[in-house]
Amino acid sequence: MSERMKYIRNFCIIAHIDHGKSTLADRLIEKTGFLSEREMDKQILDNLELERERGITIKLKPVRMIYKAKDGNEYELNLIDTPGHVDFTYEVSRSIAACEGALLVVDASQGIEAQTLANVYLALEHDLEIIPVINKIDLPSADPERVKREIEDIIGIDASEALLTSAKEGIGIEEVLEAIVKRIPPPQGDEDKPLKALIFDSFYDNYKGAISFVRIVDGKVKRGMRIKMFSTGKVFEVTEVGSFRPDLYPVEELKAGEVGYIAANIKNVKDTRVGDTITDADNPADSPLPGYKEVVPMVFCGIYPADGEDYENLKEALEKLQLNDASLVFEPDTSAALGFGFRCGFLGLLHMEIVQERLEREYNLNLVTTAPSVIYKVYKTNGEVLELDNPTKMPPPTQIDHIEEPIVEATIMVPTDYVGPVMELCQERRGVYLGMEYIEKTRVLLKYEMPLNEIIYDFFDALKSRTRGYASLDYEFKGYKKSDLVKLDILVNGEVVDALSMIVHKDKAYEKGRKIVEKLKENIPRHLFEIPIQAAIGSRIIARETVKALRKNVLAKCYGGDVTRKKKLLEKQKEGKKRMRQIGTVEIPQEAFMSILKLDDQK
């Protein structure tokens, strides 16, 4: 190992939402004198407005600090940020692979949460040195000793030397820096071997093209070199390399062990895939770094402009977002009810919400979204297998042999008082109980196998409301399982409304269908003819409501008189209404669609 590499430390921070990760990062940057107080912006590393608002980290932003340790040497510390949310697990695993150590930040008053656990296990798989940091010790409810015991019980790492800090008050920051220098090993690697660099993130710059954030494992990279991507085999010429002092800072070359960025006039972030290996095109390495996999969208939904004229703007906005977010996929889609729009694929629910919110906020679009769905595998009787992400493409029931749906293993961490309601919720959502273990006396770790379809809709909200916000959830994809699923169609005035079709479990179809028709009845205005609203599975109607017609009182001018006269007038009115119903069309207002998507929130 070269002399230079002894003084490099690459580390990441693992923490649950709101346990103080970004604030701690700010303090470390401030302490190393890297930015003046004036430049210190709260939560330097969270660039998107949305990130600050929700207090979550979505896009990673690495930073390089120089720290003069107590032993008199100057160390280069590279902090690689990790997103803390389940949707971005693969991104987290790549960030972790770029480090040798991790700070595990736990809130002194709350203890460990399910998502933190998932990320810690990832870090342990990559053999990282984990330094527990118990943050927010200035809070009156802080109980560092209990949290230490939790860390030892649950994760099984020694917490006797856990650091006690308060990032907000700036307590214990120096100890954290010293621990990074002393306890995290320096990077391994050989700068004389052919270049191998791991991409752990990328973003799109209007002038320089797609910029890859890399950790150099072997070899070195400098301007003018030709580089090759392992996954696509494409070759580019390097135009700039540099490090992060939070902003991009060009340097001559990056060598093994260092963290930095590479710009090479790459037109599309699809070519700088997270987890891919970059090598020298003229002297390539034999094999890529392990662990790369293509990111597969798990959740799909249709996004349509509320105003048809916004279609082009929506397309442009999605293309711009895709420049920075390679995991977002979309294709044009049309719906008889909603007009032209796009079918989009996301990593998970949070990802979907963020994309929708950014479209509405940053591009001022008014959107209508259809109910989210997952990818089903439909096995047809002729031996064909279809992968369905859109319920409207489902073949007729007679052609289907069976359907498989994606299953996830959910880990739920919950206070003991709420175990009952949570188990009940999981059972309602077709969960299969796998096991539970008590952590301390106050909290329980529950494991369930559940269909992704049941989680994706509003499971998280329901979980939070039944546990008053105390539960935390983590899930990982397990595979596909055969299930009894049917397509539920909604007919308004005898015509199928494609935007409302959904795939549901047979046992829940009746209840779901009934709820939707009731909701639609409230939201569709009365017309001059009566409108039947029906829920159907195939050709079988399972629920019906009728929106009564508005009618004129045709008997108003009959005073007394013969009953047959009245009958004649009523019959005539009825005939007219019948004729009207055959040729009339029903406009379904936007609110009706929205009300159906929010159905489950009212439980």
From Swiss-Prot:
InterPro entries: EF-4, EFG_II, EFG_III/V, EFG_V-like, EFTu-like_2, G_TR_CS, LepA_C_sf, LepA_CTD. The gene is lepA. It is an enzyme of class 3 (hydrolase). Its EC number is 3.6.5.n1. SMART domains: EFG_C. It is a peripheral membrane protein. Residues 6-188 form the tr-type G domain. Required for accurate and efficient protein synthesis under certain stress conditions. May act as a fidelity factor of the translation reaction, by catalyzing a one-codon backward translocation of tRNAs on improperly translocated ribosomes. Back-translocation proceeds from a post-translocation (POST) complex to a pre-translocation (PRE) complex, thus giving elongation factor G a second chance to translocate the tRNAs correctly. Binds to ribosomes in a GTP-dependent manner. It is found in: Cell membrane. Keywords: Cell membrane, GTP-binding, Hydrolase, Membrane, Nucleotide-binding, Protein biosynthesis. NCBIfam families: lepA (TIGR01393), small_GTP (TIGR00231). It comes from Caldanaerobacter subterraneus subsp. tengcongensis (strain DSM 15242 / JCM 11007 / NBRC 100824 / MB4). GTP binds at residues 18-23, 135-138. GO terms for molecular function: GTP binding; GTPase activity; ribosome binding; translation elongation factor activity. GO terms for biological process: positive regulation of translation. This is Elongation factor 4. It catalyses: GTP + H2O = GDP + phosphate + H(+). Belongs to the TRAFAC class translation factor GTPase superfamily. Classic translation factor GTPase family. LepA subfamily. Pfam families: EFG_C, EFG_III, GTP_EFTU, GTP_EFTU_D2, LepA_C. One of its GO terms (cellular component) is plasma membrane.
